């Protein structure tokens, strides 16, 4: 299946979630306790959110937890610094320990815009009054990526069916519950379609971010884990020796590239500055280098449809 945008993906999500017996689409809320902790840790960065739009005012940019905070800071700080220069706004990063922390921070106006995966973007639109305004384009020019199931290179398993047959003996590293490629997509294609529950079929199931899962599989701390092609490409650059220790046993249909979401009630002046900056960013060698560290080449316009 190919998804044309967030709405077609959302329709699929609603059907797949129903088939997995999980909560219905829309409504509900992310973990407020996580958000409260994340908000407290980021209180200083959030102090200027309500005054966005004026020269030098603070805009808080939420970044989902796909790898360690230190790695995220290293990759994101040059981009956010460029955004600040080009917009005249003070763009500050907002990191949380999980995806729910960023969603809830947007809901309570501690975050003005954010980089999400498709599932977390849908939740931000439904629960945090968010609005999709842009989509990333990969550094190879494509606008999609894939969920993966990985095992150690020494593992005898070659397919997801091999893994499922021996699941009762194995430890499984699942993704963040709000992750599209780390949890939702494999949850449907690997588990729901085979009429099994990932939380029950394995000897033990853990939840972590993409980087942590890959490292755990490579170091034989777990037997199998979820990952994605974006993370794989990043790891080939940063930790090629780790990638050599991994083997792919399952690959999903294509998932749309990641959306950027801002709060609907952000002032129009700030929205225009941010959109103008992003739609032209990536045209110089310096900008291309900054985006390449994030796995992207440029941005294109998008919306909730």
Summary of predicted features, one role per range:
Residues 60, 64-65, 139-148, 240-278, ...:
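Periplasmic-binding protein-like
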Residues 100-114, 127, 145, 165, ...:
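Short helices/loops that flank or line small-molecule/ion binding pockets
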Residues 40-42, 47-122:
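Extracytoplasmic small-molecule ligand-binding "clamshell" domains
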